[in-house]
């Protein structure tokens, strides 16, 4: 009897890729696939600037490639933020830049450091280049600079800090960001992820963009997905020392900002009135919502202080986070339950419209009272 033919070995991924758990985005549907009001992905409840929508609709011929360098968009970003456009690199969302930063500056055997309850993409960014993710302890769900610095070793190559942090909403003031940077060796890249930075009151500016100008080892990333309301276009940007920008430009995807994305982004960044309106709306509704939740403290409901466009709520009483997550679906809302990030006791809820936040707060109150 003839021997069975030997099948060729199948391609095998690198060992470190097998350790990656795929990113889980906020859901859009609930039980049985019903469409719900989505307050799980931190999108802008005011939508998108009318100017950006108009520019997107007249972006040009989709059969043609976009400007590979996004020159006009970089110039507009530079004008608004006082940055030399040559020191700006564009990304397909800031996620691309976070991954590229790890890829460019870390590799097998190196360490990538971030705080517990940091953005889940940091773990993926570290593992996809073969580096070891190192998680520093938190301080009551916030960033502890001393704990981060204590975790630095001779193998540390990249430190990620989201400010404000996702999913906790915590924020480090300028002095603490500067202290973190001062405590790092100059050969360690500090990535300051400012996806939610535009939601900060200008008086609370954390100094990240200033550090990007003066330091040789700082990369600041920003996104158009949050306050600009352009999540569907996937536009991110970063700034830092020219050598860092050069490295990221070498390995980013070509034509990585679409024709419509460049047109919409250009109009959006010039419409700072929309940005300010979004910031005011968010601050007002967040304060109202948190106040209603704090009134439920005797039921074990604890909203964490937030400087972002969401609130992380801890449920430490009879009603669990899972109870509320499922219960809010019956009211027509999908929120973000976070057991996969070590927060089974917490829900992250995006700040929506006034009516939405009032209805959610009332629903949580009803659930708590029913559990007594």
UniProtKB/Swiss-Prot annotation:
Superkingdom, taxonomy of origin: Bacteria
CDD domains documented for this protein: AAT_like
Q: In which pathway does it act?
A: Amino-acid biosynthesis; L-histidine biosynthesis; L-histidine from 5-phospho-alpha-D-ribose 1-diphosphate: step 7/9
Q: Where would one find the signal peptide in this protein?
A: none
Q: Choose any GO biological process term that the UniProt entry carries and state it.
A: L-histidine biosynthetic process
Q: Which UniProt keywords apply?
A: Amino-acid biosynthesis, Aminotransferase, Histidine biosynthesis, Pyridoxal phosphate, Transferase
**Record-level Gene Ontology MF annotations:** histidinol-phosphate transaminase activity; pyridoxal phosphate binding
Family, according to the entry, reads as follows: Belongs to the class-II pyridoxal-phosphate-dependent aminotransferase family. Histidinol-phosphate aminotransferase subfamily.
Q: What is this protein called?
A: Histidinol-phosphate aminotransferase
What is this protein's gene name? hisC
